[in-house]
Amino acid sequence: MDKFTTLEGVAAPLKIINVDTDMIIPKQYLKTIKRTGLGKGLFSEQRYKDDGSENPDFILNKPAYRGAKILVAGDNFGCGSSREHAPWALLDFGIRCVISTSFGDIFYNNCFKNGVLPIRVSQADLDKLFDDAERGSNATMTIDLQAQEIRGPDGGAIKFEIDPFRKHCLINGLDDIGLTLEKKPSIDAYETKLKTERAWA
């Protein structure tokens, strides 16, 4: 998992509440267990028309937001069924941070395990971030995980809270496997000791 320290990029405003995981990545894209290639399916029912052509009105199809790295979204983002493909799709598209007032619990947890930072803010702060994001390509924001700050295009900062353990994992690029490997010296020492104490086993 790539480390997350500071992220700077365009923020796309998605002013929709209750965006569920089926909207983020529809079920037809769940047949694969590969984490790559899912960006094309991100919000596919909103991004594409029935004939397969792009919907020019959808935010991520607008020229200013095609390269968005941050998504500013409405309340209760990522609700609905459990599917780890949702953060995979965001990440494959290029989005590493989602900001909202609240998230679906399972989606929230899956984000941290896959290198995507979900940030909870107040409604007042979200409204300010929506205003900033609507500036288009001039809406560059900086997410400073170490300082726990969102810095807008005008230099103003919004503080956010994050669990210290999850912060540690993101900054150091540690997923579940990485966390286990951190303990490898202790695991090896235990196994060596066990072989000595239970040579008969």
From Swiss-Prot:
InterPro entries recorded: 3-IsopropMal_deHydase_ssu, Aconitase/3IPM_dehydase_swvl, AconitaseA/IPMdHydase_ssu_swvl, IPMI_Swivel, LeuD
Keyword Iron part of the UniProt annotation: no
UniProt-listed Gene3D superfamilies: Aconitase, domain 4 (3.20.19.10)
Reaction(s) catalysed by this chain's protein: (2R,3S)-3-isopropylmalate = (2S)-2-isopropylmalate
Protein's GO biological process: L-leucine biosynthetic process
Gene Ontology MF, one: 3-isopropylmalate dehydratase activity
UniProt cross-references to Pfam families, sorted A to Z: Aconitase_C
Keywords: Amino-acid biosynthesis, Branched-chain amino acid biosynthesis, Leucine biosynthesis, Lyase
Catalytic EC class: lyase
Known EC number: 4.2.1.33
Subunit relationships: Heterodimer of LeuC and LeuD.
Protein name as it appears in the record: 3-isopropylmalate dehydratase small subunit
GN (gene name): leuD
